[in-house]
Amino acid sequence: MRSVKIKEVIDALERFAPLPLQESYDNAGLQVGLTEAEVSGALLCLDVTEKVVDEAINKGCNLIVAHHPLIFRKLAQITDVNYVQRTVIKAIKHDIVIAAMHTNLDSAVGGVNYKIAEKLGLKNLRFFGRNKQVVNPQTGESVTGGDGVIGEFEEPLAADDLILLLKKKFDVECVQTNELLRREIRTIALCGGSGSFLLQDAIAAGADAFMTGEMSYHEYFGHEQEIQICVIGHYQSEQYTTEVLRNIIEHDCPGVKCCLSEINTNPIGYFS
C-alpha cells in the first residue's frame, strides 16, 4: 500500500468540508507543522491540549485533527504562559502537525450536525437557518452548506420520551429544557455546540423541538408550548465529531491509522 502524506489527509478533509464554509470568526485548517511527511497515524479529538499531544506521541500519530481550533486568536508570542502556547511548542518539538475542522465541518453535508441527526434516527434531513453556497477551492465545484439540520422522527414521541432518548444517545445524566410540550414531537431542529442563535430559525422552520449544546438563561423565556428546547452540553453534543473525521479519512485515505482520542477534554465538570 502506498504511503500517504499528511497533506493528502488534510486535503481530503477540506474537500469534504471546504474552508470557505467556516464562519468569519473561525480559524479552521492547518494550524501547526509541515505537511510533506508521511502520515504515521491521525489522532482525532474535539480539543487539543498538552495531554492530547502526549497521547499522539504514545500512539505513534504525527497528525492531530481536532474539531475546535487550538489557535483561535492570533498569538503575540510562543512561550509557556498558557496551555495553547505550551501545546504548540510540544507539537513542534515532536514533529506533530495540528489541523482543525470546525464550523466548516458543522456546516457541511454529512458533517457534525448530520451525524447528530443520524444518532437520533432522523429522516428527511435538510439545512435550516442560513444556507451557504461556496466554491470548493480544490475542485472548483459549488458546495452547499447550512447552519443547522432539521429532520423528522419516523414516529412522533412525547416530550419526556425525547429527553430519555437524548440522555441515552449522548450519555448525559440530565438535559436542560423549558416547560415540557403537551403535544407530540415529530420535527426536531438541531445544532451542535453553541447553537442558540438558531432558535428563532428553528421555530420559523416549524420544528417541534430544538436541540443544541448550550444556551443562556434568558433565551429560554417566552417559548412555553411553542417549541421544546433541549440543551445537552457543548462537549456532549459534539462528541461524535471524531467518527465523522475517521469516516472521511478511511474513505479517502485508506490504510491511514485513525485513533479516536481517549482523553475527555471537556473543561466543564458535573457534580451531584
Predicted regions and their residues:
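Hydrophobic structural segments
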Residues: M1-S272
